[in-house]
Amino acid sequence: MVLGCACALWRVPAVQLPLWFGYLGAGGALVWVDFKTTWLPKRLHWIATAQVTAGLAVVAVHSPGVLVTALAGACATSGVFWLVWRFSGSFGFGDVRLGLLVGAAAGSMGLQAWTTALLAGTLIGAGWAIVHALRGRASEPFPYGPSLWLG
């Protein structure tokens, strides 16, 4: 996980580092809890959201365009996830809240990165779901948050 975070930070423009520190720091703790318990605690989510928001505020001073794309990514991701949660029940609401953070971080890198991140997270989640089912646990919930976060 640490190596993955270091690799992610290596690719991020320096002006966006405050946003990504919040995403990888508190967001990483959030998905670790999800991985272990299939539960995304609200309090930890709000801490991660506050850190990402503070990072976005710093980024906006230097690059206002990044703020627009990050907010668009956050709204689009959490909006789509809300629709899936509301009408299919296949997501927990914690995944909807996590979509806000993932969308902001991925959106800050542009439309192509946002699309790639969501596709990668979905593919990682699908792979994890297959492994989960092959282990005979298909009827049990599995944590989608970590795969989404890794995307």
Predicted regions and their residues:
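Interfacial loop-to-transmembrane junctions
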Residues: 129-151
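Functional transmembrane core segments of multi-pass inner-membrane proteins
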Residues: 25, 29-128
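N-terminal transmembrane signal-anchor/hairpin module of polytopic inner-membrane proteins
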Residues: 1-14
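Short charge-dense sequence patches
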Residues: 2-3, 52, 102, 143
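Extended, charged alpha/beta regions that create polyanion-binding interfaces
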Residues: 20
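Alpha-helix capping and helix-coil boundary motifs
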Residues: 13-17, 63, 133-137
